[in-house]
Amino acid sequence: MLLLIFGKDSRLKYFLGALIAVAVILFIINIVDLNRYVVRSVAIYDSKIKKRLKVCFVSDLHNYACTPKFYEDIREYAPDVILCGGDTLTATKGRKQDRAYAFLKELSKIAPVYSALGNHEYRAMIYPEVYGSLYDEFLSKVKEYGINLLSDDSVYFEENNIKVTGINIDRYFYKRFKVFKMEDGYIESLAGKLEEDKYNVLLAHNPDYFEYYNAYGSDLILSGHVHGGLIRLPLLQG
């Protein structure tokens, strides 16, 4: 129950009213953002890149039914490879994942697909007693559609001198409202020793640990998880 008690001071009343109005507006904006996508094009130049590679990065579809325009936009971009940041599934016991698999199938028709795991796939993998055969089913579809899974694994595009690595940080690091300390060498234990002569791309689902990914030395870090980005609040560190 929410109980608001107003006294004679109308300033408090106006302040609380304004606060509620701002909260409602932010909530509406959040709902809208969660149900749309924005296409951003970024050009990266680096002396280690031998030849241009057009990459499309998508993440956190969560068993969503994509519109034809979504796929048209990707086809129009004509990527050489497609990178997935994870959470193609929504790990809910007994829930059908048909739309997630349709998404992977359509992507595989456009370009070679390389996918990391998100926390939902990772959860399905480590808790089969909860999610049953969900992860095995996911692996079966990945194999059927020729998706390349980067689960603490890498792929090297020799012609471009670009190495892409996907890592799975422990479930412990996905606890809400808390960022934990990672031990020295933890990212290297997942990704392997950094090859500094290559252009290194790291697929790391949770962006909260950017400082650790960056310390590892990757040239480019691609994350998902936060569904619309992070907002830094001044003075509050949140």
Predicted feature locations:
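Structural motif
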Residues: L53, D80-V81, I162-K163, Y199-V201, ...
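Membrane-embedded segments
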Residues: K51-N148
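Short loop/edge segments at beta-strand edges and connector loops
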Residues: L150-D153, A204
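Conserved beta-sheet core of the metallophosphoesterase superfamily
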Residues: E144, V201, N206-G238
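Binuclear metal-dependent hydrolase catalytic cores centered on His/Asp/Glu-rich metal-binding motifs
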Residues: M125-G146, S154, E158-N200, F210-E211
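N-terminal membrane-anchoring alpha-helices
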Residues: M1-I49
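Catalytic metal-binding/acid-base residues of hydrolase active sites
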Residues: H62, T88-L89, H120-E121, S154-V155, ...
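Extended recognition/assembly regions associated with phosphoester-bond processing machinery
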Residues: F27, N35-D46, E188-Y212, Y216-G217
